[in-house]
Amino acid sequence: MLTRVKSAVANFMGGIMAGSSGSEHGGSGCGGSDLPLRFPYGRPEFLGLSQDEVECSADHIARPILILKETRRLPWATGYAEVINAGKSTHNEDQASCEVLTVKKKAGTITSTPNRNSKRRSSLPNGEGLQLKENSESEGISCHYWSLFDGHAGSGAAVVASRLLQHHITQQLQDIVEILKNSAILPPTCLGEEPESTPAHGRTLTRAASLRGGVGAPGSPSTPPTRFFTEKKIPHECLVIGALESAFKEMDLQIERERSAYNISGGCTALIVVCLLGKLYVANAGDSRAIIIRNGEIIPMSSEFTPETERQRLQYLAFMQPHLLGNEFTHLEFPRRVQRKELGKKMLYRDFNMTGWAYKTIEDDDLKFPLIYGEGKKARVMATIGVTRGLGDHDLKVHDSNIYIKPFLSSAPEVRVYDLSRYEHGADDVLILATDGLWDVLSNEEVAEAITQFLPNCDPDDPHRYTLAAQDLVMRARGVLKDRGWRISNDRLGSGDDISVYVIPLIHGNKLS
C-alpha cells in the first residue's frame, strides 16, 4: 500500500490529474471513452465562438483571454472573461452558463410538475429580452441565473452541469412558485392543507367570521386541523435555498445514472447565482469563490470546501464507517507521517471531535496513510482529490486500488442570500464570481483593489466596462510569460490553471427592489 500511496502522491501533489479523456484519476467504472458524449465539448455559448476560434483559444503558450463580443448576450451588462491553463489539461475544463429562467406552475395545482411545464428563455443566440424582470404571463416568475463549473479529470461533468443544472433549478422552483409570489403569506406546512388567505403575521379569526362559519372557521372545509404543538415559521427564502440544494442533488444523481450510457468524465465544482424576487442566492459546492464589492467593502458570499475546511466532517464519516477506508487509511490527523520506530511513543494528533491538538500513544493503525494529507492547496483526500464538494466523480478511486472516494464527497452547496432591496447600489458595486484559478494567486483584497481602481476610470455608461474589468482580473491572475514561467506583480508565480470570471453589476438590482 505504501508504494501505491507514494505513487498517488507523486501524481497528485501538483494538482488534480487532468485528462480530457482520462480514466477518472485511475478509477474505472461504468463511464468509458467508448461511450458517446452527453454533450459535445465547447466554450460557453454566450461567447459566440466559431469552432476555429474555440481551437485557437486552446493555445497553452499564448493563453489568449476570451471576452464577450456582445455585452447584450448577458443580462445586466454582466462582464465575463476566461483563459485556458498553461498545459495542465488539453482543454479549458471550466464551463459557464447564464440565462433568464421563467418558472411557471402547472395550471390548477401547486404540486410538483414535469419540466415541460416550465419555460426557459435562453440568452442565446442574441440575448433579446434579457432585461425583462417579468414576462407577460402572470403565473410565471422570472429569475436570472449565472453559473461557473470547474472541471477536473476531464470536462464531461462540467459540460453536463452547465447544460442541465438550470433545468433542475427550474423544476424545483415549480413546486413553490405560487407560494413565493405571495410574500405576505407564510409557506404552509403541508401543501393544500391551509387556506391561501392566511396572513403571515398570524392565523387568527375574527369572532364575526367564526360565527358566520367563514373560511377558516371551526368546522369549515378550509379549517386547518387542530394542533396541540407549535409549528416552525419557515421564511420564503428558505424554500428557495431548499430548492437550490435539491437541484444540486438531482444534478449529481443524473450524472450518476447517465454515466452508464454516456462518457461523462471526471467531476466539477459548482458556483451559481440566482436572482429571484429581489434577492441574490449564491450557491457554492467546491473551491470557487464569490464576493461582493460594495462601496469598497468586501462581502464574502461563499465558503471554500476543501479537505482542510471539511476535515471534521470527513474524519467523522470515516470514524462511523471505517470500511470506507479499505483498511489502508487512518481517519486521525498527525502533524506528519508516523514512522514505525515511533510505535509506543506519544505524538500530537487530532480526531473528528477536536479543533485543538492532544497527545496519543502511537499504535499500529496509526501507521496507515492519513485520510487527509498535505496542507493548503496541496491537501488531498486519500492522496487523490483537493475538493470535497461538487458534482460527478462517481468512478473516482484511490490510485491503484478499489477504494471509492465518492462517499466522502458531497454535492450539497452552501447557499448565502443577499437582499438587493436593502441597499442603493452604485455603478461600481459588483458581484465577482471566479474559479480557483483567480483566487489561487489573488486575494479578496487584491481583487477588490483592482476593481475599485479600474471601474471609476471607465465611462459609467459604457456597456463594456464590466467585461473589461473581468478581462483585467484575468490578466492580473494569468500574468505575463517570462523565462521563468507566467509571472504577476512582484514577480510572483501567476496562475497556471483555467481562469473564469464574472463581474456582475448590482446597480441593475435597484430596479428589482
Curated annotation (Swiss-Prot):
Instruction: Read off the InterPro entries from this record.
Output: PP2C (IPR015655), PPM-type-like_dom_sf (IPR036457), PPM-type_phosphatase-like_dom (IPR001932)
Domain PPM-type phosphatase residue range list: 77-506
Q: List its EC numbers.
A: 3.1.3.16
User: Catalysed reaction per UniProt?
Assistant: O-phospho-L-seryl-[protein] + H2O = L-seryl-[protein] + phosphate; O-phospho-L-threonyl-[protein] + H2O = L-threonyl-[protein] + phosphate
What keywords tag this UniProt record? Answer: Cytoplasm, Hydrolase, Methylation, Nucleus, Phosphoprotein, Protein phosphatase
**Compartments, record wording:** Nucleus; Cytoplasm
Positions of region (Disordered): 109-133
| Omega-N-methylarginine carried by residues | 212
Matching Pfam families:
PP2C (PF00481)
Q: Might you report a single GO cellular component term?
A: synapse
**Protein origin, superkingdom:** Eukaryota
An example molecular function term from Gene Ontology annotations: protein serine/threonine phosphatase activity
Chain positions found as Phosphoserine: 7, 123, 210, 220, 421
Phosphothreonine occurs at 113, 223
What is the annotated role of this protein in its UniProt record?
A: Dephosphorylates CDKN1B at 'Thr-187', thus removing a signal for proteasomal degradation.
Q: What protein family is recorded?
A: Belongs to the PP2C family.
Q: What is this protein called?
A: Protein phosphatase 1H
Question: Which organism was this protein described from?
Answer: Mus musculus (Mouse)
Gene transcribed to yield this protein? Ppm1h
